[in-house]
């Protein structure tokens, strides 16, 4: 590693203007990145980490501007450089992998064209050479069948595939510095590992430096030599990664270490807490069941799936030709009252399709889902209405699952009104209580989804799911969009509510790190089938399948605290 810094930020201040006032977003931030080095900026939403990164290449949103300080890249101060000089540095000097693949890919252009555009704009390749290089870059970013994928549009890609396309674009010009802004937040842990391994390989091969922006301290400590911890626009701690992980000095850093699921999953305290929650939840669930003679007569199993299969018709090369794609293949499991069963697997494993069949949103091709002894697909209108009240979902995407035209109050109050629960005043009190439970101020009630962060939106989705006091909650990647601190908070909330109300959870996730804190039983799915089913402890201590071992090995920072 060279003694001369590649990037040197000193006393950087960034402000945003609102109603004539200047609001500081980044305050006196200093950091250094050397050639070939990986430095991670860690912090929760709103800490200023992305603002710091975007100020380097003059891509601050809206009214954001650098008010003081210097940003020296390769000897040149970009804070004082002209627009043309900064644009010349982008791509070949500094590459960017942005966070949100939906808003950073053009929906009307093919993926291959968007990669070629980067290559041609920077004079790397043209024509056939650019087309071939686009395929190679997608392959490097971990995408199978890249030759076919380059001719597809962003809407034909899953979220993870779109993120890989952005990574291919960011690395296209072999930059000296790559700014990776939450580059794997949309990816499964195994793909996350593959992508980050690739970034590591690139760093060592080409001497490319990486500035990694993340909220996961476990991931940051595993991938970076140096950590910069930010809180409310300031750097609160900075130093070698392992030192910060094992001996955090600042209170906020200690909180991050305690909250990261990848690290918490290794602690025995997580296991002990889960055992206590299960014991209490099962007891409460039995009391609730005993109070209802109809329920008590059924069994301890609140949801039973038997030989579930779901096939989708895939359009062929001509309109009259189609093939069957089997998304779920002969899946059976039981969800006991007051417990949590986690379904774990990569994108495309069929876990969300199982969740939709349990919720009655998809009808199985064959097999059945029974809730309290009644088959969900055969419920009449009245039975289906009652079922909706007793089984509630928390969906994966907080952007798509909330109506943008509804205020937060109306969003949470709507299920109460639909099921004719309480007076208007009582419903308002319930909404306030639910917001408090998910750590949101009551002032949020008057706001709309577009005024909230992704994490806040997901907390609203959790509050809405709990509004009807359901017996079963189906959580489809319910915490994947959240910062680690909020993630830990929501997992604790779900545990507390389970113990208090005797709830049963079907927890869909790609992240085994989260599972240990919330689940009692685990089903591991791969390409539509269950490949392993066991208790959480058995899966963590003695996995029988190679695929499960791969998922466990992919948990970021898994062995750092032990080492």
Question: What name fits each language-model region?
Answer:
Residues 57, 61, 359:
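Helix-to-loop junction immediately C-terminal to a conserved catalytic motif
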Residues 165, 170-171, 460, 466:
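ABC ATPase C-loop
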Residues 235-239, 247, 530-534, 542:
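ABC ATPase "signature
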Residues 152-157, 161, 448-452, 456:
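Conserved ABC ATPase signature
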Residues 172-176, 467-471, 487:
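A short, proline-enriched helix->beta-strand linker immediately N-terminal to the Walker B motif
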Residues 65-77, 367-375, 387:
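Conserved ABC transporter NBD signature motif
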Residues 77, 129-148, 375, 426-443, ...:
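Conserved ABC ATPase "signature" region
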Residues 23, 78-95, 113, 121, ...:
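ABC ATPase NBD coupling module
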């Amino acid at each position: 590693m060279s003694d001369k810094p590649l990037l040197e930020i000193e006393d950087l201040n960034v402000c945003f203007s609102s109603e004539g006032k200047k609001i500081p977003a980044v305050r006196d931030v200093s950091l250094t990145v050397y050639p070939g080095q990986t430095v991670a900026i860690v912090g929760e939403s709103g800490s200023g980490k992305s603002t710091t990164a975007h100020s380097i290449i003059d891509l601050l949103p809206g009214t954001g501007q650098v008010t003081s300080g210097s940003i020296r890249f390769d000897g040149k101060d970009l804070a004082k450089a002209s627009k043309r000089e900064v644009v010349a540095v982008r791509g070949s000097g500094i590459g960017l992998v942005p966070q949100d693949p939906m808003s950073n890919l053009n929906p009307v252009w093919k993926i291959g064209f968007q990669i070629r555009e980067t290559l041609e704009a920077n004079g790397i390749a043209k024509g056939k050479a650019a087309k071939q290089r686009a395929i190679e870059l997608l392959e490097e970013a971990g995408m199978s069948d890249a030759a076919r994928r380059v001719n597809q549009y962003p809407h034909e890609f899953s979220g993870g595939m779109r993120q890989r396309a952005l990574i291919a674009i960011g690395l296209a010009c072999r930059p000296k510095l790559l700014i990776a802004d939450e580059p794997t937040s949309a990816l499964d842990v195994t793909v996350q590992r593959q992508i980050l391994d690739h970034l590591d390989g690139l760093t060592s091969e080409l001497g490319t430096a990486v500035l990694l922006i993340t909220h996961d301290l476990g991931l940051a400590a595993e991938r970076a030599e140096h950590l910069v911890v930010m809180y409310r626009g300031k750097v609160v701690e900075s130093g070698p990664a392992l030192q910060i992980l094992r001996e955090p000095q600042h209170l906020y850093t200690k909180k991050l270490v305690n909250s990261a699921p990848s690290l918490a999953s290794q602690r025995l305290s997580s296991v002990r807490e889960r055992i206590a929650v299960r014991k209490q939840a099962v007891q409460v669930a039995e009391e609730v069941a005993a109070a209802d003679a109809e329920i008590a007569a059924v069994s301890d199993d609140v949801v039973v799936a038997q030989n579930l299969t779901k096939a989708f018709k895939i359009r062929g090369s001509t309109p009259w030709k189609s093939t069957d794609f089997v998304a779920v293949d002969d899946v059976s499991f039981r969800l006991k009252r007051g417990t949590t069963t986690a379904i774990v697997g990569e994108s495309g494993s069929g876990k969300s399709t199982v969740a939709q069949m349990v919720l009655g949103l998809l009808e199985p091709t064959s097999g059945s889902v029974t809730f309290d002894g009644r088959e969900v697909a055969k419920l009449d209108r009245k039975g289906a209405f009652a079922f909706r009240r007793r089984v509630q979902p928390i969906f994966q995407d907080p952007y798509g699952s909330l109506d943008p035209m509804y205020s937060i109050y109306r969003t949470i109050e709507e299920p109460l009104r639909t099921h004719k629960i309480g007076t208007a005043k009582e419903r308002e009190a319930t909404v306030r209580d639910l917001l408090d439970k998910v750590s949101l101020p009551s002032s949020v009630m008057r706001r709309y989804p577009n005024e909230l962060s992704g994490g806040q939106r997901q907390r609203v989705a959790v509050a809405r799911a709990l509004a009807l006091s359901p017996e079963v909650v189906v959580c489809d990647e319910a915490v994947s969009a959240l910062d680690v601190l909020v993630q830990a908070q929501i997992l604790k909330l779900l545990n507390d509510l389970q113990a208090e109300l005797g709830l049963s959870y079907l927890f869909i996730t790609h992240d085994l790190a989260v599972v240990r804190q919330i689940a009692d039983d685990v089903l591991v799915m791969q390409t539509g089938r269950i490949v392993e089913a066991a208790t959480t402890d058995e899966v963590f201590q003695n996995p029988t399948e190679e695929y499960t071992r791969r998922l466990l090995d992919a948990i970021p920072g898994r062995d750092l605290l032990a080492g």
